Each structure stands twice: as C-alpha cells, then as structure tokens.
Amino acid sequence: LLVRPDITFRLFQFLNCQEIDISFLKNMPHMKRLRIDCIDFKSNTNRINLSVLAELSLKSLHMECFDLIDYEFIQNLSDELEELFIMADTMGAGIRFDCTWLLKYKNLHTLWLGKKAKKNLEKINQLPKLKSLSLRGIKLTDFSFLWKMNLEKLALLWNSNSNLNELANLKSLKEIELWRINKLSDISFISELTNLEIIKLQDLKHVTSLPDLSRHPNLQRVFLIDTGINVKELPNYLQEKVSNWDNR
C-alpha cells in the first residue's frame, strides 16, 4: 500500500462473526482507500467498532452495510477525505446522518449517497471541490441547489422522478447517468448539456428516443442498456458512439 496507495483495502461478509474488531487497521498507516461491505448490522447494531475510522488517514471510504443506523462516525474522518460512498439502506425508518457533517471535508470531490442519507442534502453545494455526485433512491423535487456547483458528473439512480428538466442548467456536466427512473420518459434536457462526454441510460423502458445531440462536440460514448431506444433509428453519428454495456 505504500507503493500503491490507489489500491482499495476491502472488508466484507464475516458471516460467522457476531462482532468484528477492525482496530488492526491502525497498523496500516499507508492505507488510503477502504471499503466495508456485505456486512449486515440487523442482528447487532454495534457489530463493528467504526470509531477506529477516525484514526485512519483515509482519502476514500466506501460503506455498503445493510441496516447500519448510526453514521455519526462520518463526522470524524480524516480531513484528507476525497471520496465517500454511503449506501444507507435499511429496513427501518431512518438513519443518523446529516449532510452538514460533510462540509468539513474541503477536498471531497466524489460523493455517492443512498436513499436515507438525504438530510440537509442541499448543503452539499457548499463543498468547494465536489465534481461527482451520485444519488440512489433519493427523489428530488427541486434541483436548484445543484446550479451553484460545477459538477462534472451526475448520476440519478432508482428514483421516481418524472421531470428532470431543471438539470438543463448544469452546463458543466461532462457525464450523466440515469438508471431505473421508472416514470421518466422525457430526456430532452440533455440537448442543453453541450459539454457532455458520456451519457449512460439504463433500465429506462419509457425512454424511446434521444434528443438532438449534434451540438455536443465532445460526446464520446452513449451507453444504452435496457431502454426503449431503437439504436438502428439513431443518426449515424450517434450509432457509432453507442454501446449496450459499460466496459469502462
């Protein structure tokens, strides 16, 4: 890890362990990227001593743990944090998480939030370096808080939005991903995002056509995965950019 700080150290499953002691991570000073996933907290809400994370010099943290309720440890991570992934999936009513906790991380450039990590979501527009935002299961009725940001990537996943026209104001976007937005049929706003390089549409059965993309000089790839769009009906300049799987 000293030689390859880009490598992610992963902790997962521990199916037969009622309690998991991760204090050994303090003996790995060169670890910068950590992923903790496939661990269920339903039977024991204190299954892992997550307070240990405050003693690590993490630049990237990926948390995908079912029924994890208390995320207060997020407030005490390293000031070096650049990437944060929080699945926030539970069977219960809610979690302890607040987006205002993230404002101390001035170097945060990539943020992925799951459906219950949405309290004070609009405050993330105060993160000066945030470039990539992914929201899963979070339905927004007002996107205007995003207009103040210079986002380069936006991903909206698993929500019930039917009108995304406000996204036309995000002129700095280079990549947009829309995935399993069941009520969505109109994506005409994409024609206004002329800096786009990547468009990814997945599991959008009601989306049957692409808008005019002839004013998108930087467009490189268009991923169309399980949509209602007939690729053969697209203009030739688009057909050559289309792929039905994301191989990046």
Predicted regions and their residues:
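Serine-hydrolase catalytic core
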Residues: 190
